[in-house]
Amino acid sequence: MNISRRAILGVRRPRRRIAAAIVGLLAGCTFAFLLQLDTAMPPGGWELGVAVFAAGLVVAVYAGWARGGAFPGVGSVLLPLLWVAILPPVVAYLRGREYSGSRYSTIRLSDALHTTGTELELAIETVPYLLVGALLFGGAAFFVGAGARRLSGR
């Protein structure tokens, strides 16, 4: 494997750990969201969406530190961003108007009198902006991890 491919795709073992961490994180957060455990968080505590994004950034730093690859590092930020933007409207769309109140931990577009279908369409339209955000934040987090590894002498 040449050096540029290794930098982009990473080493196999850390790449698998990154994938397992993100899949586990999103699965756990999905269950917490569906069971409405995110509404039981203490006042002033982090909302579930912010916590998922922060965990994705931590995984991206780990990707840089463990030579997991830039692509898995950026992906570890993109997937939580997609989760935060798309899962609540999908749940609202599938359940109908049952969740039209202030149930969500993300900003509700239905507060601006959108239907659940329109809310889902608008969430899907934000995907290119989420990709740009993931490239910026995930890339920066990856380079922080890679720089920390280089500074530590490993």
Task: Show where each model-derived region lies.
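Hydrophobic alpha-helical transmembrane segments
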Residues: M1, I22-L26, A70-V84, H114-A140
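Haloarchaeal acidic low-complexity proteome signature biased toward cell-envelope/secretome components but also
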Residues: M1-F33, G147-R154
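Transmembrane alpha-helix entry/boundary detector in multi-pass membrane proteins
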Residues: R12-A20, A32-A55, I124, Y129
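Aromatic-anchored segments of alpha-helical transmembrane domains
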Residues: L26-L34, P80-A92
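Canonical alpha-helical transmembrane segments
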Residues: E47-L78
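Hydrophobic cores of alpha-helical transmembrane segments in multi-pass inner/ER membrane proteins
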Residues: A54-Y62, L131-G145
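Juxtamembrane non-transmembrane "cap" segments at the membrane-aqueous interface
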Residues: W83-A112
